[in-house]
Amino acid sequence: MTLRTTNQRRQLARQQPPLLPEDATTIAHCLDALWIKHGLSRHTLNSYRRDLEGLARWNNGRAGPLATLTPPALLDYLTWRTQQHYSPLSNARLRSVLRTFFSYAVECGWRNDNPSTLLAHPVLPHPLPKALTESQIEALLAAPSIETPEGLRNRAMLELMYAAGLRVSELVTLPVAMLNQRQGVLRITGKGGKERLVPLGEESQHWLQRYLEQARPSLAADKPIPADSDGDVPLFINTNLKRLSRQQFWRWIKHYAALVGIAPNKVSPHVLRHSFATHLLNHGADLRALQMLLGHRSISTTQIYTLIARQHLQQLHAQHHPRG
């Protein structure tokens, strides 16, 4: 079975009927409440919105308003998604969104029960995070041409992402005020508004300094860089003085990977974060320290990287031990 690509899912969504006003209002109220209560990021809220609007459009009022749907209606929708080749991981995420949404509906008094709790939750496999080798990382980081302001900016972004293990959303939204060059640290606001301090190595500080002194003024054409809608001045900008998008950064990484002979389908912004974690563990980093650097709420999320490190040790043993 071939799973649907992102573009195919978007095209399918456009074929669905328009959102009913009552459902649109319900979704908006729920997202506002989630933002106030949990401080969810814009990216997470947009994901919630897409999932809830997808269900609402599919239902189109047939089984009643969105907030009143029953377990059979939800099961019908999940069955339809499976027939449309949505991935098990995507459907598992939808179940999580539905639990949150209907819990909010109960809090608001729109219903007395949470129908999503009656849905079966299949056990999903936990694929190991993909990481590049250290030599591949070195080649990828050196791929941008530093002769142009854009290339120098991209080099600094790649260096920073790998040095600090940032999520791509954290990188592109990073305010300049969160960089402390004197102490060589970043203050990162991660998922759920959780803050963490991340130290920077000499190499990433070198490229950041070059970006700030050479590329950033050139990209801004020496104009003052305005604050965004959140009141923050972005660290990384384009020629329109705006922060960069995740999609732009994704395309650049694919392009640079192809330039240095790495299969583009094996590279994504998150692969740099996985590589950061894997390489630290391979060199003896403490798991609790890695948890803090990555900004994970639970140590169990961080522990998956130990499996990759264990594989690395097994490979070394097999290659170099006389009885390997």
UniProtKB/Swiss-Prot annotation:
Molecular function GO labels: DNA binding; tyrosine-based site-specific recombinase activity
Cell cycle is among the record's keywords: yes
Domain of life: Bacteria
Residue intervals of the Core-binding (CB) domain: 21-106
Gene Ontology CC terms, in alphabetical order: cytoplasm
Pfam family, one: Phage_int_SAM_1
Entry's transmembrane regions: none
Record key words, sorted: Cell cycle, Cell division, Chromosome partition, Cytoplasm, DNA integration, DNA recombination, DNA-binding
Subcellular location: Cytoplasm
Residues annotated as catalytic: 167, 191, 270, 273, 296, 305 (o-(3'-phospho-dna)-tyrosine intermediate)
Coiled-coil residue windows: none
Record domain Tyr recombinase: where: 127-318
GO biological process: cell division; chromosome segregation; DNA transposition
HAMAP family named in the record: Recomb_XerC_XerD, Recomb_XerD
Function: Site-specific tyrosine recombinase, which acts by catalyzing the cutting and rejoining of the recombining DNA molecules. The XerC-XerD complex is essential to convert dimers of the bacterial chromosome into monomers to permit their segregation at cell division. It also contributes to the segregational stability of plasmids.
Record note on quaternary structure: Forms a cyclic heterotetrameric complex composed of two molecules of XerC and two molecules of XerD.
Family: Belongs to the 'phage' integrase family. XerD subfamily.
Name of this chain's protein: Tyrosine recombinase XerD
Native source species: Xylella fastidiosa (strain Temecula1 / ATCC 700964)
Gene (name only): xerD
